[in-house]
A protein has these predicted regions:
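Penicillin-recognizing serine hydrolase domain
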Residues: 1-139
């Protein structure tokens, strides 16, 4: 990821692990997270992962029916879509040090938008704050 960040020209982002768990040397800014999301949506594999509501993993010896993985963003927004806006992809996050976070990718009238929210005090605030932004600030 750090190599990709260099390719994208990001100067205020650095990754130390792939889990997203807190590390003093792992950081980004909202603007750079938006750039990362835009780049991820240009990658067909990343776009598919970020836009999938639910996925059943391959069965294993320990999980003979596979494991059902559900997007926390899509499950939280279910039934509360923003009129005229299609939220197509996103990723939630939470660590104590950063609070609840969200990056999502939306489309309205053929134009694409990225919304980044951080330091939320509750898992629902980021979702509904992004709805408010899309409702009140998109042309």
């Amino acid at each position: 990821m750090n190599k990709k960040c260099d390719e994208l020209g990001l100067k205020n982002t650095h990754f130390e692990n792939t889990s997203g768990l807190y590390n003093d040397n792992q950081y980004t800014t909202p603007i750079e997270m938006a750039i990362i999301m835009r780049a991820a949506m240009d990658n067909p594999v990343c776009a598919k992962v970020l836009s999938t509501y639910q996925y059943d993993s391959t069965p294993t010896d320990k999980h003979t029916e596979g494991i059902k993985l559900t997007s926390t963003m899509f499950s939280r927004m279910y039934g509360n879509e923003v009129e005229g806006v299609s939220i197509q992809a996103g990723k939630t996050g939470y660590v104590y040090e950063s609070g609840h976070c969200l990056v999502n990718y939306a489309e309205k009238d053929g134009k694409h938008y990225v919304c980044v929210l951080a330091q939320g005090t509750n898992k629902w605030h980021c979702i509904f704050d992004s709805f408010d932004i899309y409702t009140n600030y998109l042309p």
